[in-house]
UniProtKB/Swiss-Prot annotation:
This is Transcription factor bHLH100. CDD domains: bHLH_AtORG2_like. The keyword DNA-binding applies. Residues 61-113 form the bHLH domain. Plays a role in metal homeostasis. Confers tolerance to high zinc (Zn) and nickel (Ni). Its main location: nucleus.
Length: 242
């Protein structure tokens, strides 16, 4: 009965052959034996080659340099505006201002600062005159019997250096001493100094006070040389200074 059962895989009349050929692992002589292409190029090498190609392009390099310069320029501008905001009054520093708002607030604040500087300079002049007048009056009272002592302190001059090219000069003299203040101004201007401003006042102690804001055109102000020059100008008018 078993012999009548047909095989599971019929050969349809073809010989089955040797099955040992398919059971072996040696397929070196088959049609599958062909060389594979070399695909070992890495991503890094490709990227490096692309970057080298871009850097060799003058248009790309110009664009990269422009972008770098623009970033640096914006960084400097932001730093300058940040410094400008820090100079504004505290009420304007509570919130971050835009560029246009910062410039607007600065333009409004500059005249206020200029007015404050004028008031402070005026106050300084008044204090300097008061101190100089008190010192001279005390010396005059103590030496009222000595005419030479009174004469030697009849007039005084002092200078305050404001900057490398500017100086404030204060002159104190007795009203009884006759000297032309215009002669002093003329002599100073002949020496290359520019008169920025001048003022005068009178105290209760019979003294006159003059203030001159001078600026030199070329070079720096030398306080000692300026004092000697004023001393010479006043000596021409019959004054002596200490």
């Amino acid at each position: 009965m078993c012999a009548l059962v047909p095989p599971l895989y019929p050969n349809f009349g073809w010989p089955c052959g040797d099955h040992s050929f398919y059971e072996t692992d040696d397929v070196s002589n088959t049609f599958l034996d062909f060389p594979l292409p070399d695909l070992t190029v890495t991503h890094e090498n490709v990227s490096s080659e692309n970057n080298r190609t871009l850097l060799d392009n003058p248009v790309v390099m110009k664009k990269l340099n422009h972008n770098a310069s623009e970033r640096e320029r914006r960084k400097k501008i932001n730093t300058m505006f940040s410094s400008l905001r820090s100079c504004l009054p505290p009420t304007n520093q509570t919130k971050k201002l835009s560029v246009s708002a910062t410039v607007s607030q600065a333009l409004k604040y500059i005249p206020e600062l200029q007015e404050q500087v004028k008031k402070l300079m005026k106050k300084k002049e008044e204090l300097s005159f008061q101190i100089s007048g008190q010192r001279d009056l005390v010396y005059t009272d103590q030496n009222s019997k000595s005419e030479e002592g009174v004469t030697s302190y009849a007039s005084t001059v002092s200078s305050t250096r404001l900057s490398e090219t500017e100086v404030m000069v204060q002159i104190s003299s007795l009203q009884t001493e006759k000297c032309s203040f215009g002669n002093v101004l003329s002599g100073v201007e002949e020496d290359g100094l520019v008169l920025v401003g001048a003022s005068s006042s009178r105290s209760h102690g019979e003294r006159l006070f003059y203030s001159m804001h001078l600026q030199i055109k070329n070079g720096q102000v030398n306080s000692e040389e300026l004092g000697d020059r004023l001393l010479y100008l006043y000596e021409k008018c019959g004054h002596s200074f200490t």
